[in-house]
């Protein structure tokens, strides 16, 4: 077998369409473009979404607000009232709360909210705090520290 004897498998190739070669060829005269008009001329034709001058669909539909975020931030949420069960002067992190069973599911970095009362001084380390949570932790003599989201995600990957 030589290179000039190699042919494609039967039925794998289609004959190309020869347009403008007479009426008997099937694509003669107007070459399959119909009679006149913008779609028969050379060039790009109409833009996508053009409806012939009718008000297009994307302009008929109202502009809706409050679409959901594509990549929303998901936090593991806890209120300061739940931290009341911990011993005074302990360091509170997502890992320590998981170990003690106060938080059962890890939905992402820890966020502390201000619902409930807190009477013990604690050192709380979390990715985010609400204003009321910061005030309640500081009022008891405790401290709070904002961890970066990356540092918390790195510890989650290690586990």
Swiss-Prot record:
PANTHER family named among the record's database cross-references: 50S RIBOSOMAL PROTEIN L15, LARGE RIBOSOMAL SUBUNIT PROTEIN UL15M
Protein source organism: Rippkaea orientalis (strain PCC 8801 / RF-1) (Cyanothece sp. (strain PCC 8801))
Homology family: Belongs to the universal ribosomal protein uL15 family.
Region described as Disordered: spans on this chain: 1-51
Compositional bias of kind Basic and acidic residues: 1-13
InterPro entries noted in UniProt: Ribosomal_uL15, Ribosomal_uL15/eL18, Ribosomal_uL15/eL18_sf, Ribosomal_uL15_bac-type, Ribosomal_uL15_CS
Compositional bias ranges of the Gly residues kind: 23-35
Name the record gives this protein: Large ribosomal subunit protein uL15
Annotated Gene3D superfamilies: 3.100.10.10
Name of the gene this protein is made from: rplO
């Amino acid at each position: 077998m030589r290179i000039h004897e190699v042919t494609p498998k039967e039925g794998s190739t289609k004959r190309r369409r020869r347009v403008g070669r007479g009426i008997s060829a099937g694509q003669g005269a107007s070459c399959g473009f119909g009679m006149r008009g913008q779609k028969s001329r050379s060039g790009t034709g109409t833009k996508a979404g053009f409806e012939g001058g009718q008000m297009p669909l994307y302009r008929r539909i109202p502009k809706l607000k409050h679409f959901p975020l594509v990549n929303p931030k998901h936090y593991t949420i806890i209120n300061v009232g739940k931290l009341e069960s911990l011993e005074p002067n302990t360091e509170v992190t997502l890992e320590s709360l998981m170990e003690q069973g106060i938080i059962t599911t890890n939905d992402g970095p820890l966020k502390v909210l201000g619902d409930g009362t807190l009477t013990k001084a604690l050192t709380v380390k979390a990715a985010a705090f609400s204003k009321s949570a910061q005030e309640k932790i500081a009022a008891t003599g405790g401290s709070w520290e904002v961890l970066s989201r990356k540092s918390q995600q790195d510890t989650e990957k290690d586990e």
